[in-house]
């Protein structure tokens, strides 16, 4: 950097009031700049001082291949030993999938940036919501939960997952239809595929992988919950397996690689001791091994079931819970006569 002429008083003021950016180990010859100024740095360069208050733009560039060689000693190589595993976990995630799902902020955080739905900064606000005063003692755990403010994600920070239906049957369905659609979720799945993935149902697998990776590497709990809900929808859609057999062949491959990344007891509910995954896959295998299903899918499902039984000692031989009598809550006003 060339020496600059500056008023001594201004220089003294900026020395104490201005900012300093420290940049260590920048290779000689690198082009470095701040705002409209840029330089090719020498061996003694360590940063910039006396930066005036305000917004600034720092930029740098390796000007040629020779300089890239100098940078080599400061760079860690990509661990290619894990590349195959990474590809297997992201094989259906396209650029369009990332653009559609990633937060508008383009940052994925383990803990959501949340705001209270209602500010309730003052006692009168709490009274308006029929909430007890903060100083009073909680009489139960549920009361304690009720006192917590309702929160919502800060706009632009949430992962934009597809909205999954909570009602699995069409409006106006008869009691018999409600029961059928509650046991076979194909109607709900087709609604998701038609609205979110028109013309390309395989893209739902990209969203399944995106959710899993966000949980596995980013520790995003909301992504794990979405992965479970989406997987449940896919595994409990018997009619859809016949229609979208190629999608389900690929689903088995995806699950094979995903389940290799987590402990066998990870999905066990600590309260009920029920294993979400075994119960969900039990229904899936029961449907996928049907004679009505494509032979390729059926054969792959049988091999996958045998693999999981051997590796995790999961029992899929027992009768699925879905074969037991199912109690279905009918919408208000639905007649059973």
Curated annotation (Swiss-Prot):
Keyword Acetylation set for record: yes
Modification N-acetylalanine occurs at: 2
InterPro entries for this protein: AAR2, AAR2_C, AAR2_C_sf, Aar2_N, AAR2_N_sf
One GO cellular component term: spliceosomal complex
CDD domains associated with the record: Aar2_C (cd13778), Aar2_N (cd13777)
Family: Belongs to the AAR2 family.
Protein name: Protein AAR2 homolog
Organism of derivation: Oryctolagus cuniculus (Rabbit)
Gene that encodes the chain: AAR2
């Amino acid at each position: 950097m060339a020496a600059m002429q500056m008023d001594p008083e201004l220089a003294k003021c900026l020395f104490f009031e201005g900012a300093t950016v420290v940049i260590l180990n920048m290779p000689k010859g690198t082009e470095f700049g701040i705002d409209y100024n840029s330089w090719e740095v020498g061996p003694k360069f360590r940063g910039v001082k006396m930066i005036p208050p305000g917004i600034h733009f720092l930029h740098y560039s390796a000007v040629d291949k020779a300089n890239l060689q100098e940078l080599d000693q400061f760079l860690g190589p990509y661990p290619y030993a894990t590349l195959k595993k990474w590809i297997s976990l992201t094989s259906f995630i396209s650029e369009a999938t990332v653009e559609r799902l990633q937060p508008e902020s383009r940052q994925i955080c383990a803990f959501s940036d949340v705001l209270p739905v209602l500010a309730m900064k003052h006692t009168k606000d709490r009274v308006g919501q029929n909430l007890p005063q903060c100083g009073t003692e909680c009489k139960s755990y549920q009361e304690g939960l009720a006192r917590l403010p309702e929160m919502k994600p800060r706009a632009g920070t949430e992962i934009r997952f597809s909205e999954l239906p909570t009602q699995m049957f069409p409006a106006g369905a008869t009691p018999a239809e409600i029961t059928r659609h509650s046991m076979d979720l194909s109607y709900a799945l087709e609604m998701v595929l038609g609205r979110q993935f028109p013309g390309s149902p395989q893209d739902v697998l990209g969203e399944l992988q995106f959710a899993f990776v966000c949980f596995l590497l980013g520790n995003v709990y909301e992504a794990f919950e979405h992965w479970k809900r989406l997987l449940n929808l896919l595994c409990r859609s018997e009619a859809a397996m016949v229609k979208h057999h190629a999608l389900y062949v690929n689903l088995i491959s995806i699950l094979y690689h995903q389940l290799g990344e987590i402990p066998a007891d990870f999905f066990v509910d600590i309260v009920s001791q029920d294993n979400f995954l075994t119960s969900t896959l039990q229904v899936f295998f029961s449907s996928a091994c049907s004679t009505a299903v494509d032979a390729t899918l059926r054969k792959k499902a049988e091999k996958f079931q045998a693999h999981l039984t051997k590796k995790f000692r999961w029992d899929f031989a027992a009768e699925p819970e879905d074969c037991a009598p199912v109690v279905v809550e009918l919408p208000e006003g639905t007649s059973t006569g």
